């Protein structure tokens, strides 16, 4: 099945503590989750690793967020938009449902 949200897409968060925030997709996980730049930040307590000369402390990093809590951001309308699929020149492409504009 083709993915509606892919790496380097700009997405907007629909629900949760980061609702309304926009970010770029860094990684898509096979478990139906996505890691988005600057979204769903968590604090990780890290032990020092002297062998690697790594200091310990509290590190802030992005945690995975469910794909169902995200929507693709449409730059022409400035809003979240739904994604559809269609065939153009024998290739399957994604498009925005509201404007019928092809994505990338």
From Swiss-Prot:
Keywords: Ribonucleoprotein, Ribosomal protein, RNA-binding, rRNA-binding. This is Large ribosomal subunit protein uL24. One of its GO terms (molecular function) is rRNA binding. It comes from Yersinia pestis. One of two assembly initiator proteins, it binds directly to the 5'-end of the 23S rRNA, where it nucleates assembly of the 50S subunit. One of its GO terms (cellular component) is cytosolic large ribosomal subunit. Belongs to the universal ribosomal protein uL24 family. PROSITE patterns: RIBOSOMAL_L24 (PS01108). It holds the Pfam family KOW. CDD domains: KOW_RPL26. InterPro entries: KOW (IPR005824), Rib_uL2_dom2 (IPR014722), Ribosomal_uL24 (IPR003256), Ribosomal_uL24_CS (IPR005825), Ribosomal_uL24_KOW (IPR041988), Translation_prot_SH3-like_sf (IPR008991). SUPFAM superfamilies: Translation proteins SH3-like domain (SSF50104).
């Amino acid at each position: 099945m083709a993915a509606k949200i892919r790496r380097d897409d700009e997405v907007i968060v629909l629900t949760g503590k980061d609702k309304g925030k926009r970010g770029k997709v860094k990684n898509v996980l096979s478990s139906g989750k996505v890691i988005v730049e600057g979204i769903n930040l968590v604090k990780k307590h890290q032990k020092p690793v002297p062998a690697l000369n790594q200091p310990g402390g509290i590190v802030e990093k992005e945690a995975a967020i469910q794909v169902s809590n995200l929507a693709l951001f449409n730059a022409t309308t400035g809003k979240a938009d739904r994604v559809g699929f269609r065939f153009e020149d024998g290739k399957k492409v994604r498009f925005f449902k509201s404007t019928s504009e092809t994505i990338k």
